[in-house]
Amino acid sequence: CSKGGVGRGYGIG
């Protein structure tokens, strides 16, 4: 999972 700019974890990848 990649980290978003706002500091939220996204379940992508």
UniProtKB/Swiss-Prot annotation:
UniProt KW Nucleotide-binding keyword: no
Domain of life: Eukaryota
Protein function: Inulin-specific lectin. Has hemagglutinating activity towards rabbit erythrocytes. Has mitogenic activity towards murine splenocytes.
Record-level Gene Ontology MF annotations: carbohydrate binding
The keyword NAD is annotated on this UniProt entry: no
Keywords on record: Hemagglutinin, Lectin, Mitogen
GO biological process: one example: positive regulation of cell division
Name of the protein described by the UniProt record: Inulin-specific lectin
Subunit structure: Homodimer.
